Amino acid sequence: MKVALFGGTFNPIHIGHLIMAQYVLNFSQVQKVIFVPNGHPPHKVEDVADAFDRFEMVKLSIEDNPYFDISDFEIKKSNPSWTIDTLEYFSSIYERVYFIIGSDNLSEIVKWYKAEEILKRYPLIVLPRERNLCAIKKEIEKLSSKYAQDITLIQMPVIDISSTEIRKLISQDKSIRYMVHPKVEEYIKRKGLFKR
């Protein structure tokens, strides 16, 4: 089976994440998208919900879609997980593993731990996070020519919604209706998440 890994903090997961994952299913060769919430995001320390809560919110968001799955691989690790470790783990289970990346991270991926190994061994699925398609395509061409890897750009509208904005609205006692799955909205209210 061909799967795509969708890693992220998902703090919280929102409708934009779900739409992006559905576009990956619609316009790539993958048969399943696996959401992989970060356990200990080293670059994000403030206002990050507990890993268990973030995992539960993803689970609630995707439970009615048989083509979406979730993994606690990174959450179960006691230390921050490197992307290469996650990709290698899933490669031992699945026939082909694709890595979903936002176009805003394309120029940064070369600085990641074991970047060359990632770029040589794993095909990328790029989701547009900005509207400048020419710049995105240039970056893809640069990486493709250097690493001779399969990089697919998913042509889709830019989803202009962010977890940061959702947390801000919650802290101001504003509605997040339609921005997250209704079960996630209910979970956030019940647990009192993201209140300052």
UniProtKB/Swiss-Prot annotation:
MF term (GO), any: nicotinate-nucleotide adenylyltransferase activity
Keyword field contains Transferase: yes
Top EC category: transferase
Alphabetical UniProt keywords: ATP-binding, NAD, Nucleotide-binding, Nucleotidyltransferase, Pyridine nucleotide biosynthesis, Transferase
One of the protein's GO biological processes: NAD biosynthetic process
Recorded metabolic or biological pathway in which this protein acts: Cofactor biosynthesis; NAD(+) biosynthesis; deamido-NAD(+) from nicotinate D-ribonucleotide: step 1/1
Keyword NAD: yes
Catalytic activity: nicotinate beta-D-ribonucleotide + ATP + H(+) = deamido-NAD(+) + diphosphate
Classification via CDD domains: NMNAT (cd02165)
Entry EC no(s): 2.7.7.18
Entry-linked Gene3D superfamilies: HUPs (3.40.50.620)
SUPFAM superfamilies (alphabetical): Nucleotidylyl transferase
Task performed by this protein: Catalyzes the reversible adenylation of nicotinate mononucleotide (NaMN) to nicotinic acid adenine dinucleotide (NaAD).
NCBIfam families from the UniProt entry: cyt_tran_rel, nicotinate (nicotinamide) nucleotide adenylyltransferase, PRK00071.1-3
Record-stated family: Belongs to the NadD family.
The name this protein goes by in its record: Probable nicotinate-nucleotide adenylyltransferase
Organism expressing this protein natively: Caldicellulosiruptor bescii (strain ATCC BAA-1888 / DSM 6725 / KCTC 15123 / Z-1320)
Name of the gene: nadD
